[in-house]
Amino acid sequence: MKKVTMNLPEIKDYRLTEGLNQLKTNLAFCGKDIKVITMTSSVPNEGKSSVSFDLSKTMAEGGKKILMVDADLRKSVLAAKYHIQGIDKGLSHYLTGQAEIEDIIYETETEGFYLTVAGPLSPDPTSLLDSEQFQKFIDKVRDDYDYVIIDAPPLGVVIDAVIIGKYCDGAVLVIEQG
């Protein structure tokens, strides 16, 4: 498995740390069958990608094996935001038959934290996410990880998060503070 490097900013706000710990605990209380979680928001720029990333990292630091999947195939910000280096294939490569599952999962510098990025923009992201190939991906990673955190597009913009949600065990709606 390939390893990526990235800029991992330290979480300095105790309120964010406490919120992530509460979310992590609440997910654990949902039961062992709740493993694949969609993270979305109602509109862009509410912080869902940051919460998805920070939650995944926090859970991994707590001893869980976590896969974070960037499924925002239209407007992904993850790779650029965290300056991720060493990635050559993403989810869209797998969904279009250009890569195998093992080619799109990367180990991070945090033990237990694995990552799949969105990959290049596709002409029809909705069809890719509503495909048998995406179902196969979810079925495979569900068995291999303690939790799969899927960063989905905002609900109020495109239908993709609803489609992704049908393959998941639960959803978290992130809203901007204030």
Each language-model region and where it sits:
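P-loop/Walker-type NTP enzyme "switch/lid" segment
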Residues: 2-17, 21, 25-26, 30-32, ...
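Primarily NTPase-proximal linker/entry elements flanking Walker-type ATP/GTP-binding cores
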Residues: 30-36, 57, 61
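Conserved beta-strand segments of the P-loop GTPase G domain that flank and frequently precede/overlap
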Residues: 38-40, 117-118, 150-151, 173-176
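Hydrophobic positions on the alpha1 helix immediately C-terminal to the Walker A/P-loop
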Residues: 50-51, 55, 160
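Active-site signature of alpha/beta-hydrolase-fold catalytic machinery across serine-
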Residues: 54, 58, 81
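Alpha-helix C-terminal capping segments
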Residues: 58-62, 163-167
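Hydrophobic anchor at the start of a short beta-strand
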Residues: 66, 148, 171
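Conserved Switch II/interswitch segment of TRAFAC-class P-loop GTPases
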Residues: 152-157, 168-178
